[in-house]
């Protein structure tokens, strides 16, 4: 039963999944693009409290940084989404948009982890922070995925 059952199960799963394989990266693209856009959209208009918080972390040019973070998140999210669509008509341009947007996500998330969430370790920290820190890591890893892979399926 063991090996034969596993082979049959694998064949069944392969049969079910194979029509959807070409769309699997679209699910990641939609999740990251929408999530990142919404993170930025929630910061606009830029609130003085956000600027003050950035300044309290020792960042010079806190007002400019707040603007760049908010708009960077929105534009990177849009770029992740439209990079795939543009890539259907002009593959090189779509690939560049996707990779640059993924790189922007990486830079923003590294900054967020180091600045905003530096006390939220994976195995220690405030109650509930482990889950939130993992969300930040997932966003960073998805950005890295698109920066490396681009639109290559």
Features from the language model and the residues they span:
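Extended, low-polarity transmembrane helix blocks
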Residues: 2-45, 64-71, 75-153
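Membrane-interface interhelical connector segments
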Residues: 44-64
């Amino acid at each position: 039963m063991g090996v034969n059952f596993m082979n049959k199960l694998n064949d069944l799963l392969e049969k079910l999944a194979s029509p959807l394989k070409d769309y699997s990266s679209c699910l990641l693209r939609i999740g990251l693009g929408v999530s990142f856009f919404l993170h930025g959209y929630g910061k606009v208009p830029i609130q003085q409290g956000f600027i003050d918080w950035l300044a309290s972390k020792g960042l010079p040019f806190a007002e400019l940084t707040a603007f760049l973070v908010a708009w960077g998140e929105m534009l990177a999210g849009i770029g992740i989404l439209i990079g795939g669509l543009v890539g259907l008509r002009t593959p090189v341009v779509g690939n560049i948009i996707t990779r640059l947007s993924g790189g922007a996500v990486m830079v923003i998330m590294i900054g967020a982890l180091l600045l905003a969430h530096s006390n939220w370790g994976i195995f220690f920290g405030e109650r509930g922070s482990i889950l939130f820190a993992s969300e930040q890591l997932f966003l960073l890893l998805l950005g890295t995925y698109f920066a490396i892979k681009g639109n290559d399926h």
